[in-house]
Regions:
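N-terminal alpha/beta PP-like core and its mobile active-site loop of ThDP/TPP-dependent enzymes
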Residues: 1-123
Length: 123
């Protein structure tokens, strides 16, 4: 049976979403391990910059860019840039990492409690 990451990369590849911009933390390590050679990963420091870089790339490439920020705190940091991208009508696909299931039992600091609510209304 294929791994979730393999299925994910195959889907992204089929959709032409091979540019990823992010500020990885430990929760994203498995996503970045053995990162596919036909994908481009753009590393940016701090999530505001991550979304701003992705905004510019998506506009320049004239296609959606995948953005990965680091948990709920990362979404919070990115809100100003998300507002700008929303007003620019830039096609971004935003994901936020989450703590491992075992860690979620103790509600660690970086837990993303309401991941679909936090970035509203801009995502």
């Amino acid at each position: 049976m294929p791994l979730v990451r393999e299925v994910t990369f195959n889907l992204l590849r089929r959709l032409g979403l091979t540019t990823v911009v992010g500020n990885p933390g430990s929760t994203e390590e498995t996503f970045l391990k053995d990162f596919p050679a036909d994908f481009t990963y753009v590393l940016a420091l701090q999530e505001t910059n991550v979304v701003a870089v992705a905004d510019g790339l998506a506009q320049g490439l004239k296609k959606p860019v995948l953005v990965n920020v680091h948990t709920g705190a990362g979404i919070g940091n990115a809100m100003g840039a998300l507002l700008t991208a929303c007003l620019n009508k830039t096609p971004l696909i935003v994901t936020a990492g989450q703590q491992t299931r075992q860690m979620l039992l103790s509600e660690p600091f970086l837990t993303n409690f309401e991941p679909t609510q936090l970035p509203r209304p801009y995502v």
